[in-house]
Amino acid sequence: PSSAASDVYKRQVYEQNRPIQYLYEPLGQSRSLSVHESQSLFFENHIFKSQTYFKIINTIFDNSQDLEKSFLEHYHTVRINPIRVSADEFSYPIHVFIRYQIEKEIFKNKIKFKEIKDLWNKKFLHHLEIDLISDSEGVLQDIHWYEGIFGYFPTYALGAMIASQIKYNCSLFDIFLKNPNEENIKNLVTWLNNN
C-alpha cells in the first residue's frame, strides 16, 4: 500500500476511537502529535512492510508470481530519494533532521527567506549526496511551511520511535505475524485503541 493509504487508514481508526464523551476536553484529544504519527507509522512500517503482509498480498494477486519477494526487495532496499515521503527507512530520519536544522536557523534569525533554498540544497548534498535538480524535489516538496506549520517534522522521527516501542510491547503483533487472520488484526487494532 502507499504510505498515504496506510496513513489515512490508521489515523482514522485512531480518531474514531477517541472517547466521544470527552471529545472537546483534553482527555478526548490525541496524546500528542508524535503519538498521532506513531499510529500510522506502526501500520506503515511494521505491518504493511512485513513479510507476513506481503505473503497475504501474494495470495490475493497470484501465487505464481513472486510478488512477495519483489515487494520485500522494494520496501527493504536502501535507495536514497530526494522526496521525504518516498524515502527509505534509512534516509527518512535524515530528511527530518535536515528540515529541523533549517527550522532552527530560521527561528534563530540566522538565515533569510531567500537563502533557504540554497541551504536546503547544500544540506541535501552534504548529508544525502543528492544534487537536487528542481525545487519540487527540494525545498517546495512539503506543504508544512507554506501552511505556517513549523516545528512539526520532529514528530515524524518521534512517531517512528513510538511505533517501534508499540511493536516491541504488543504481544498481539507477534500473534498477527504468525497467524495473519481477520480476528488477529481486529485484536491488534483493539489493543491499540485501548492502549
What does each of the following model-derived ranges do?
Residues 10-21:
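Catalytic Zn2+-binding segment of zinc metalloproteases
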Residues 26-33, 65, 84, 88, ...:
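Hydrophobic alpha-helical scaffolding
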Residues 26-67:
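Post-HExxH zinc-binding segment in Zn-dependent metallohydrolases
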Residues 20-25, 29, 78-84, 138-148:
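Acidic/His metal-coordination segments adjacent to aromatic residues that form catalytic metal sites
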Residues 1-5, 9:
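Single conserved hydrophobic/aromatic residue that forms the stacking wall/gate
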Residues 96, 100-195:
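C-terminal, non-catalytic "cap/extension" segments appended to globular domains
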Residues 10, 60-81, 85-100, 129-133:
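All-alpha helical catalytic cores of prenyl diphosphate-utilizing isoprenoid enzymes
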